[in-house]
Structure formats: C-alpha cells, structure tokens
C-alpha cells in the first residue's frame, strides 16, 4: 500500500472517453477491509445526509457510475459525480493531464501564484509529495439519456453512511440562455435522483464578463437563487464550487450572496490556474489553444488550506449556516485531518485518489478518532 504500486487509476495517456468506458484502471489493486465501520447512530449529518465519515471526492475524477462505485468501495463516503452539462459535450483532445517540473519536492504555491508559468515534464514523480499535475479537459459530458441511467446506477451503489453529490455547470452563448441552461442541467440531476447538487462556478465562463463566475458575487446570487427555487421543493441542497480569491472583501460578499440565495454549502478550491509551457520551446504544453490550465496535486495544498481557514473565519464572522467542503492537495491520509482541523466539514481528494486509491482506507484504518 505504498507508492508506487501501479500507474494511476486514470490513464493519462488515454482519452477521457476511453477512461470513462474502460476505467478505472485498477490492475493489481487489492481491496482493503475497513476497520472503522460505525454504529449508524454515530454517523455525521451533512446537509441532511447521514455519513459514516467526512471523507469524499470532489468533482473531476469520477467519470461515471463505475468510477463512483470504485470510490465508494475504496472508503470515500461522499463522492461527487463529475460535472455534467445539459447536452453531450466533447472535451479537449489528449493530452489532458501532464506532470509538472517543480523547483523542489516540498514546493507549495500560494493564491498569489495564480497565473504564473510552470513547465511540464515527462519525469514521473516517485513520491506523493512530488505529485504535481496540470489538467485540461474542457468539462466534457455525456448526453441526457446516458446521464439519467448512469447517475441512477451510481446511486444504487451507495452503502450505509454514504451519499453522492452531482456536479453541474451551464453552457450557452448569452446571459439569458446561460441561466436557463443551468436550470436545464439541474433538472437532469434531479430527475436522475440527486441527493445533493453542486454547481461549478470555478471554471472559465465568458458570458458574465468575468474570468470565473465566482468572482462575480451578484452573478452567483442570480444563478444560485434560480437553482435553489428548482431544488427546494425537492428538498435537495445546493453546494457551490469556487476557487481562490485575493480580495477578502469580495470573498466575504460572495459568501453573503451565496447564503442569501439559499446555498447550503461552499466547496473549494478547484485548482490553481497557471500557464504551463515547454521548458525548451516556450510553447503551451497542452496545445496552442490551452495556454492556461489547472494545477493540482501536492503543491496546491497550502493555498487550499488558506482558503478553508479564511472561509471558516468568514462563516463565523457572518454567523452563517453555510457548510464547507475542502479540497486541493490532499495526497496523503493525514492531509484529510489538516483540512478538517482548518474548518472543513468535508475533506476531499481527487489527485490523491487517482495516484493512491488506498488513501481513504489508510485514513479510516489509522485514524485514532474512529
């Protein structure tokens, strides 16, 4: 159960479609018994769902029901079904994931590093502390009929003390169509039996005039309040996914507007957006049209923890009822505790799961509090 056993369960040399159809790639994986199965009376309550633990997977790596099934069996009690759209959408071509060349093994970025330049490398890291990747998928999505069946199938795999979030986003060419598309997408999630919905505000969008929606608290309010109206009659809570913010006042306003809209929880961070280029040529590593991409893995943990701590402070300051989901850089089991101790109600790992599918079980079986 130590690095490296096998290649990541997501094959970075294959397309997103290939990984969806044939993954996760778990040859050599040995299922581990979980030693912390609790009495249901001791489950934690999160947005009305009873969970055996606060350990989850954020939107991204769980491409369909088979990926969700694997995460559930691997000890993640709150997986997120990857971001869906209202219609089939093809993502970017391979490469979608590349390793990054860091200055040192313990390199940690801060939020002020967003937008800086890094270089891709073919060198495979040899420890989880060295695990740094960039990813650019374009948020691909399967079509409506597939999603109805597959999200329902994913729900059928839930065991006692487990639940699932369905992540959504909007797609359109005008502000009005954009809002309606969010509604159309959330209806797919609801019709498929979603217990919780997360709306992704942390990926680029040109319609609002902002690089990312979460930087515009008023746009967040408008979209979120519309979605809450759709969800409230079905008693489905809304979570919003955001990223790092340099402006504390704007972050405080974001939280105010989110709660005012009826949002139940805020998740962060997604990735750190950086420029990734070839060290020799200076050309974009992922292709000419993708100069900027998301950085994930070990080196964003500091920025993510900073976000969680700040978010927790804002919630206390505002006497808010918002819950927090923290993610970013959790690549070792003890990192879950770092996030929980910093104020997160739920701690989530994506890159950590992909490269170490035992990470959640290590936490369960080694955690003295369980």
Curated annotation (Swiss-Prot):
Catalysed reactions, as listed in the record: (S)-dihydroorotate + A = orotate + AH2
Catalytic residues (positions): 203 (nucleophile)
Binding site for FMN: 82-83, 200, 241, 269, 297, 328-329, 350-351
InterPro entries according to UniProt: Aldolase_TIM (IPR013785), DHO_dehydrogenase (IPR050074), Dihydroorotate_DH_cat (IPR005720)
Family matches, as CDD domains: DHOD_DHPD_FMN
EC number: 1.3.-.-
GO terms (BP aspect): 'de novo' pyrimidine nucleobase biosynthetic process; 'de novo' UMP biosynthetic process
Pathway assigned in UniProt: Pyrimidine metabolism; UMP biosynthesis via de novo pathway
Top-tier EC class: oxidoreductase
Entry's cofactor comment: Binds 1 FMN per subunit.
Tree of life domain: Eukaryota
Swiss-Prot/TrEMBL keywords: Flavoprotein, FMN, Oxidoreductase, Pyrimidine biosynthesis
Role this protein plays: Catalyzes the conversion of dihydroorotate to orotate. Participates in the pyrimidine biosynthetic pathway.
Protein family membership: Belongs to the dihydroorotate dehydrogenase family.
PANTHER family, per the entry: DIHYDROOROTATE DEHYDROGENASE (FUMARATE) (PTHR48109:SF1), DIHYDROOROTATE DEHYDROGENASE (QUINONE), MITOCHONDRIAL-RELATED (PTHR48109)
Protein name (record): Dihydroorotate dehydrogenase
Species of the source: Dictyostelium discoideum (Social amoeba)
Taxonomic path: Eukaryota, Amoebozoa, Evosea, Eumycetozoa, Dictyostelia
């Amino acid at each position: 159960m130590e690095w490296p056993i096998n290649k990541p369960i997501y094959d970075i040399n294959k397309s997103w479609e290939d990984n969806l159809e044939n993954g996760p790639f778990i040859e050599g994986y040995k299922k581990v018994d979980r030693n912390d199965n609790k009495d249901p009376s001791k489950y934690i309550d999160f947005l009305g769902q009873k969970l055996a633990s606060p350990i989850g997977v954020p939107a991204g790596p769980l491409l369909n029901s088979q990926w969700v099934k694997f995460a559930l069996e691997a000890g993640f009690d709150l997986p997120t079904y990857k971001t869906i759209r209202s219609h089939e959408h093809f993502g970017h071509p391979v490469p979608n994931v590349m390793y990054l060349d860091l200055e040192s093994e313990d390199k940690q970025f801060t939020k002020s590093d967003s937008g800086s330049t890094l270089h891709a490398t073919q060198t495979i890291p040899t420890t989880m502390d060295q695990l740094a990747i960039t990813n650019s998928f374009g948020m691909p999505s399967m079509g409506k009929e597939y999603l109805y069946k597959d999200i329902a199938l994913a729900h059928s795999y839930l065991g006692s003390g487990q639940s699932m979030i369905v992540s959504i986003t909007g797609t359109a060419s005008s502000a009005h169509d954009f809002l309606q598309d969010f509604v159309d997408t959330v209806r797919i999630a609801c019709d498929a039996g979603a217990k919780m919905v997360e709306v992704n505000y942390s990926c680029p969008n040109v319609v609002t005039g902002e690089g990312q929606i979460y930087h515009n608290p008023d746009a967040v309010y408008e979209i979120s309040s519309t979605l809450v109206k759709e969800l409230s009659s079905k008693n489905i809570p809304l979570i919003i996914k955001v990223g790092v913010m340099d402006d504390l006042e704007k972050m405080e306003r974001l939280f105010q507007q989110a709660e005012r809209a009826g949002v139940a929880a805020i998740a962060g961070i997604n990735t750190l957006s950086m420029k990734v280029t070839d060290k020799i040529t200076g050309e974009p590593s992922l292709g000419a049209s993708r100069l900027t991409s998301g950085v994930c893995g070990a080196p964003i943990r500091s920025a993510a923890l900073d976000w969680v701590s700040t978010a927790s402070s804002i919630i206390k300051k505002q006497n808010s009822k918002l819950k927090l989901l923290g993610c970013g850089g959790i690549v070792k089991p003890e990192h879950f505790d770092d996030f929980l101790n910093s104020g997160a109600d739920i701690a989530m790992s994506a890159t950590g799961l992909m490269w170490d599918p035992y990470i959640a079980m290590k936490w369960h079986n080694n955690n003295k509090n369980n």
